[in-house]
Design a protein with these regions (language model features):
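Intrinsically disordered, low-complexity N-terminal extensions of AAA+/P-loop NTPases
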Residues: 1-135
Length: 135
């Protein structure tokens, strides 16, 4: 499946990985600001619609993809976004939602601070497919 998004009045085909990469690039040191969200709007909306998740969850998922696939934690996310860890912990419910969608998994059931990207998610992205299509 190839996805199409509009960019500067031109249609541009973009894979899911390309959209994730763009969000990662634009989100670095962004503090998830409105300016960043506006710049990455097309990619964020594409991913949100594809995975059935919120825009904030898209950003967190993309950062986890960049920092993973193994042993991602709240500090990694905070460092990438240039936020303090407490602010990122405020988005724990979004991380939980990504777990529910099976886009992330806890590294250890006893430790909810570390998480991984499941191999099946990475494999599906390599083929530009959406893992766990939800209605």
């Amino acid at each position: 499946m190839s996805t199409t998004i509009r960019s500067n009045s031109k249609k541009k085909k973009m894979t899911l990985l390309q959209a994730i990469e763009r969000v990662v690039e634009l989100s670095e040191d962004s503090k998830m600001s409105q300016e960043f969200m506006k710049k990455a709007k097309a990619e964020i909306q594409l991913l949100a619609k594809s995975y059935g998740i919120t825009e904030r969850q898209v950003v967190l998922f993309c950062v986890c993809m960049e920092k993973g696939p193994n042993r991602v934690d709240y500090h990694d996310i905070a460092s990438h976004l240039d936020m303090n860890k407490i602010s990122v912990l405020g988005h724990a419910s979004d991380i939980d939602a990504l777990m529910h969608r099976r886009l992330l998994k806890y590294r250890d059931v006893k430790d909810e601070d570390d998480f991984d990207i499941p191999a099946v998610v990475i494999r599906s992205l390599k083929h530009n497919e959406i893992w766990g299509r939800f209605s």
